[in-house]
């Protein structure tokens, strides 16, 4: 009898033990590294020992993240990150039509362009958090105004950016800086870097790149060391050209977290967004294949580890959910591509744009706001149409001219883009990039290797679209994912992890590697401007 009972017990499978409930997140952190390419993780991974190393060892890293829209610039890119939507829906076409707003000057008369999120349409993760918990706090800070403003949409909260010598904001957010930030600005901080030299972090043997490349930095001061101005007035403007700007941004973010009490409420999580802009500056000055870029990323890797460790002393590290991405990628420099025997050039639509402006001014007494950027020729087509301009014929004529430019392989007009098949992947990229309210005439795409005018990104090429997307912390399993993933997934994925839902339709999906039961579904009917 006893033997039979023992056999029965052995044959009975043990009851599964329910997993321990995950502790509620206290803080969601988004790090945005401007112009960060995903291949930097593989190129420099063996030398990463800090924050990037933690992503490689402990996080989910999507190596084919994409800003899958046209006009791959900082403003539209940042507008996608926490909104779950493309620029066609957020209303942010480009940097030029991003956050610049003369109605909201810098607080206290500080240096910098007036700025606000008034062009931004819809909601972001912070609005969704606020809908569930009205006491939710947020801090968004960056060297660039658009990188601080757009991830959190229209929220009138703690949003700050570098205003040449101090951290500031615009009158959209208030009439004065908070006392804690005034005290922080008064510290010596960045002034101690006057006359400092940027030299390589590691011995020369650790760098495969050449140091002396004459087309870098416009042919001036293109070798190490790079010395900062000794005059603090000059340094206040020039420090953005040095890696230290990122460390200053991280330090300010840490102080803001401390002063605002982020992550220390028992009621629910808070949000911290940190935009790190120096990688973009170094990329524009020296290129993505430069020794300077290599060194910048090594330094940022170490600073991110310091930041994470310091933040973990303010907020329990096991209650922080981290994410990292970028606003856009960058192509190899034209000069490098040509040197390697590839096809490359810098086409421009500026001459045809200037001729059109002059013709409109002569004929109608107005240029109708006609401008061009990154292959898009745009303007107030509604006003043109009201004056009798045949928009269709004009667009067709301009498109024929654009097709003759070097490297151009696809050209759309409003009519042809509307009629393009869903299978036309390039058309989908342009549809996602142009806000529904934006008037335009011609959209031209260039082949890989071709860069519009004096820019280094902004096109629809994969190199400009590709960015890393990473999540780590709070038990997220480490893995690397190679399939394409849109940056519009970041906001909905963080929302699902926090246990909240978007308050409006979004096209970004919940990434199953981060939230396995998130339910990656699109709404049945998409409002105008939402393009999957």
Model-derived features: positions:
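Active-site-proximal N-terminal segment of extracellular/periplasmic enzymes that hydrolyze or transfer
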Residues: 14-60
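Short, structured active-site-proximal loop/turn typified by the sulfatase FGly-forming signature C/S-X-P-X-R
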Residues: 42-89, 130, 135-141
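A long, amphipathic alpha-helix that forms part
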Residues: 40-41, 239-265, 279-320, 395-397, ...
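Metal-dependent active-site segment of extracytoplasmic phospho-/sulfohydrolases and closely related
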Residues: 51, 299-341, 422-424, 444, ...
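Second-shell loop/turn segments in exported
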Residues: 18-19, 36-43, 67-68, 111-116, ...
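Active-site neighborhoods of enzymes that stabilize oxyanions during catalysis
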Residues: 106, 118-126, 132, 139, ...
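Short secondary-structure boundary/capping segments
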Residues: 45-48, 153-162, 286-294, 329-351
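His/Asp/Glu-rich, glycine-adjacent segments
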Residues: 86, 91-268, 277-284, 403-410, ...
């Amino acid at each position: 009898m006893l033997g039979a009972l023992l056999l029965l017990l052995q044959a009975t499978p043990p009851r599964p033990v329910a997993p321990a409930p995950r502790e509620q997140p206290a803080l969601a952190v988004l790090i945005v590294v401007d112009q960060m390419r995903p291949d930097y993780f593989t190129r420099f991974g063996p030398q990463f020992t800090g924050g990037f190393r933690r992503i490689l060892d402990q996080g989910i890293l999507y190596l084919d993240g994409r800003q899958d829209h046209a006009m791959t610039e900082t403003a539209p890119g940042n507008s996608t990150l926490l909104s779950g939507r493309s620029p066609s829906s957020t209303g942010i076409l480009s940097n030029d039509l991003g956050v610049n707003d003369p109605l909201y000057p810098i607080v206290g008369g500080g240096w910098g362009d007036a700025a606000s999120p008034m062009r931004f349409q819809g909601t972001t993760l912070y609005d969704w958090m606020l809908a569930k918990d009205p006491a939710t706090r947020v801090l968004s800070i960056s060297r660039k105004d658009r990188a601080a403003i757009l991830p959190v949409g229209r929220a009138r909260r703690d949003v700050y950016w570098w205003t040449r010598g101090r951290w500031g904001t615009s009158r959209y957010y208030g009439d004065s800086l908070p006392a804690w930030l005034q005290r922080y600005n008064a510290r010596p901080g960045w002034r101690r870097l006057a006359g400092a030299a940027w030299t390589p972090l590691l011995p020369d043997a650790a760098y495969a790149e050449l140091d002396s490349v004459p087309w870098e930095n416009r042919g001036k001061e293109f070798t190490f060391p790079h010395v900062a101005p000794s005059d603090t007035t000059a340094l206040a403007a020039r420090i953005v050209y040095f890696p230290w700007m990122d460390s200053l941004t991280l330090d300010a973010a840490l102080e803001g977290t401390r002063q605002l009490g982020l992550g220390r409420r028992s009621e629910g999580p808070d949000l911290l967004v940190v935009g790190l802009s120096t990688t973009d500056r170094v990329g524009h000055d020296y290129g993505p294949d430069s020794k300077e870029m290599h060194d910048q990323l090594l330094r940022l890797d170490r600073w991110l580890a310091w930041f994470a460790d310091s933040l973990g002393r303010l907020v329990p590290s096991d209650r922080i959910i981290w994410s990292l991405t970028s606003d856009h990628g960058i192509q190899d420099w034209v000069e490098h591509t040509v040197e390697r025997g590839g096809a490359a050039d810098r086409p421009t639509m500026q001459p045809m744009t200037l001729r059109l402006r002059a013709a409109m001014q002569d004929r109608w007494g107005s240029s109708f706001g006609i401008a061009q950027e990154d292959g898009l020729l745009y303007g107030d087509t509604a006003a043109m149409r009201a004056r009798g301009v045949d928009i269709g014929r004009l667009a067709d004529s301009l498109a024929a001219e654009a097709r003759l430019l070097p490297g151009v392989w696809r050209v759309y007009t409003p009519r042809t883009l509307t009629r393009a098949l869903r299978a036309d992947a390039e058309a989908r990229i342009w549809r996602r990039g142009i806000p529904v309210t934006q008037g335009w005439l011609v959209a031209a795409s260039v082949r890989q290797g071709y860069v519009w005018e004096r820019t280094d990104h902004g096109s629809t090429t994969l190199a400009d679209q590709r960015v890393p997307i990473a999540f780590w912390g709070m038990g997220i399993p480490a893995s690397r994912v190679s399939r394409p993933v849109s940056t519009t997934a970041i906001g909905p994925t963080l929302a699902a992890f926090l246990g909240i839902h978007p308050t409006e339709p979004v096209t970004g999906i919940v990434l199953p590697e981060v939230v396995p039961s998130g339910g990656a579904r699109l709404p049945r009917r998409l409002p105008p401007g939402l393009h999957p």
